[in-house]
Amino acid sequence: VGPITRIRKRITKRRRAGHPPVVMFDFDGVVADSFEVFYAEFTTAMRELGFDKLETREDLLKLMEGNAIKGLLRLGFPVWKLRQLSEEFRPRIEAANARVEPFEGMIELLSELAGSHPTYVITSNQTSAVEAFLRKHAVENIIEVIGADKEHSKIKKIRKVRKRHPGHAAWYIGDTKGDMVEANIAGATSVAVAWGWHSVETLQKGRPDHVVYHQDSLRSLFLPNA
């Protein structure tokens, strides 16, 4: 994205600053403390498919600095194996998600926001797995979970939500550099959380509009009188 495009997008964000928010959450690393579970299941699936370029935690975190699917292809993962990867990984991660716990305070915050503003979950996880997690923790009023099985590109997913809510200011909350880059390209105000997968130093490379270090800081962005 060039400097002129970035300036135009930030002007657009400022013009929408007085509008009510439509809030989009990433799932893994923002709501769910899932890195270790995801890492174990993903690397196991990769090894079983004969791909050995994603062995360490650092390898996975590096992959998440951009679009994960494009990153896999750049590493040499065969495009014709993507469907097989999805078929191998989906049941693993759906079963593994039963072991995943939410970050402290995030269930309450998600419920509060969903009761006050249009709220979505936009994730690279599977839609059904995230929906099961939300049901387990009694989170209601999420308009839709849009997972990788519906659309791989977060840019497209964010833009889809923006089109549904033209009178709202779009916000995307994520925990990776890739999340920040995609949110900015899609025209959403990008919020980086410091408790997720990427360090604050890495997150800053994605040019987030906000960095929050605690759930209460996130609450104050959207529920200042709570």
Q: Across the structure, where does each feature detected by a protein language model lie?
A:
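Acidic, Mg2+-coordinating phosphoryl-transfer loop and its flanking beta/alpha structural elements
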Residues: 172-213
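Surface-exposed amphipathic alpha-helices with a cationic face
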Residues: 107-115, 162, 180-184
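Conserved Lys-Pro-Asp/Glu-containing loop-to-beta segment of HAD-superfamily phosphomonoesterases
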Residues: 22, 155-180
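Short, acidic loop-to-helix structural element flanking the phosphoryl-transfer center
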Residues: 94-121, 127-131, 156
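N-terminal helical cap/lid subdomain that shapes the substrate entry/recognition surface
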Residues: 16-104, 115
